[in-house]
Amino acid sequence: MADETRLAAFLEALGSSAPTPGGGAASALAGALAASLAEMVAQLTVGRPKYSAVDERVRELIARLREARDRLVQLMADDERAFQEVSAAYKLPKGSDDERAAREVAVQAALLNAMRPPLAVMATVCYTLTLTEEIARIGKGTVASDAGCAAILGEAAVRSAALNVLANVVLLRDEQAVHDARQQVASFEARAADLQQRTMATVRQRMGLNQ
């Protein structure tokens, strides 16, 4: 009941007019859900004689997926804090030239910092998708659909986090930072799309959907 209450409270806050939590936290949560689903497939595989040949590897996947999930949960909070820093910077006084200059420096620094959580979400979820693709191949076949769900959620998390990065990029004045961020976003999105497609091909084959 306590867990249900916390989830309900988060969803209530997400759906409210409050600025946080927002898309950044939701993206990280989607990634955490993907990691949890992939872990479930692994948990249902370990200890089964049919999959004894991959048992040790599956146990490693469980540990890594759990670490990824925990990291993504932390990034939910990090994203909220980063947004609050941006908001605070925009509220700084701008009555004089000195104040405006100081405010601009603070805003640019906060925007740069605000890109870090969603970029970390993208990196962590791409790693999660790599693990998901593997468990889809070697895990219990009857829960392959759950691995597919994890892959779909994971790609959605990456694409959503990309928007949160780009929302800050368009306000940055540092051209090198803009260039680097755009390159990272494009790379992560391409990687996520490739992993999702490969995982889904495996899932469809194991579910007998290609017949």
Which positions does each model-derived feature cover?
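Preference for long, well-ordered alpha-helical segments
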Residues: 124, 128-131, 135, 142-205, ...
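A structural-propensity feature for long, helix-poor, extended segments
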Residues: 49-89, 188, 195
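Amphipathic alpha-helical interface segments
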Residues: 79, 83-152, 156, 168
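Register-specific recognition of a single heptad position within extended alpha-helical repeats
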Residues: 52, 56-59, 63-66, 98, ...
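Short, hydrophobic/aliphatic alpha-helical segments
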Residues: 2-21, 141
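Conserved phosphate/anionic-ligand binding catalytic regions in large, soluble enzymes, centered on
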Residues: 16-39, 142-161
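Amphipathic alpha-helix face/heptad-repeat signature
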Residues: 29-33, 61, 68-71, 75, ...
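Transmembrane signal-anchor/signal-peptide helices with a preference for the extracytoplasmic
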Residues: 40-52
